[in-house]
Amino acid sequence: MAGPCPLVEDSCSRLPSQSNVYGLAALPGAGGLLAATLKGKVLHFRYQHLRHKLRPVARELQFTYIPVDAEIVSIGCFQKSAPKRGLVVGITFIKDSGDKPSPFLNIYCDYEPGCEFDLDSVAQSCLNLELRFTPLQLCHAEVHIGDRCDTVFLLSGTDPGIHLYRENEGLHQFEEQPLHELFPELQELPSSALWLDVCTVPSSRRRLTAVGCQSGYVRVAHVDQDTRAVLQSWSIQQDGPISTVLLFPLEEPDDDGDVAGGHRGADDVGPSAPGPEPTPHYSLLVASTIEMSVVYRDVLSRGLTEQLSLPGSDHHDAVLCAMLACTALDGGREVLLGTYGQELLCYAYRGRRCGFQLLWTRRFPGPVLALCGADLTGDGLREVAVGCLQGLHVLQHSLEPTAQRLKERLRREVARRAQQRGGEGTGTPK
């Protein structure tokens, strides 16, 4: 039996028109969120100190070269990889040109010193690219080129294919570059990619790439970033369109319910145990529009052979979005699913024998289209931004349970260190 949601709604901002599953993007740091609507409007949502209080503020940004009759499809943003500086925003839209709609990708980036992170300045510095396909998801990924890192846009389309856009430093603009040179694992997809997820394996020069397609095809690849060699690749075929895929570390819980192996969630509180960070065991969440959502455990060791179901995930119409959170503040990761049936579902991993269990649900006034985690208030804990059909809801941790959890972890840490000192004092000298 699912319990109540431990998060409280801190704010709700109405959108000027409806959004979609690709319409929410987190700005780096505490910069807030960008929410795009179908009728060509982009809102900047953030928390601001007003009259000695922290208040949510939403204002429209005036991005240039977006026609009044344009329909925004997707939005994405990233901060340039060091040593380069600056914020990059990408917006795809379709312009109604009468007989035939015209798709475009606008990339915004200001090269004027002192304006690289000013959103209003960035919104006026546009590169307009006409597309030969209908755009879908716009995301970004970091690539290693020699001894340098660079961040690129990846745009899926209905051609079907995935297109790569990288900055040409000499020309001070972005341009499309061949996909196979940097992402050979994303070639020759059988249908349009609805969702793509790329993550770098910590303390390595390798990455994992997952893609889910409209035909139900799912592919996961393990790639050497230096040589671009595909070290391992797995694929499966499901019955319906894949709405989202998500790669994430999944560790075995210990007897206290906390995560073993030293891996800490983004919202974990309290000190961590000393020692090197272990390499996480990556698992893959696959959400389908007509089937139950599943997690393939430890893909690097087991491929796509060990499947764990998320019970009840198919009871609320299609699953549209997913993200990781740490609502229990136990160092583990919960999986959040947003559904067209207006429910937000939270699942926790209870070990190999019990698998995933439904922790809590929360209902919203409309379909849950997009989820995004970000520290919007600057308190060190990540809020959960929930994008619904015509509104943006922000959920945050309750203060009292969070403070209590912090005290518990501090007590355990003090006891652990006292036990270590006692053991050292009674050791036998050599």
UniProtKB/Swiss-Prot annotation:
Which GO terms of the molecular function aspect are on file? actin filament binding
Q: Which residues cross the membrane?
A: none
The UniProt keyword set, sorted, is: Actin-binding, Cell projection, Lysosome, Membrane
Location relative to the cell: Lysosome membrane; Cell projection, Lamellipodium; Cell projection, Stereocilium
A GO-annotated cellular component: stereocilium
Name the InterPro entries for this protein.
Answer: Kptn (IPR029982)
Where this protein primarily resides, as one coarse class?
Answer: membrane
GO BP annotations, alphabetical order: actin filament organization; cellular response to amino acid starvation; cellular response to glucose starvation; negative regulation of TORC1 signaling; protein localization to lysosome
Region described as Disordered: 256-277
Looking up PANTHER family in the UniProt record yields: KICSTOR COMPLEX PROTEIN KAPTIN (PTHR15435:SF2)
Instruction: Please give the function described in this protein's UniProt entry.
Output: As part of the KICSTOR complex may function in the amino acid-sensing branch of the TORC1 signaling pathway.
**Quaternary state and interactors:** May be part of the KICSTOR complex.
Q: What is this protein called?
A: KICSTOR complex protein kaptin
Gene responsible for this protein: KPTN
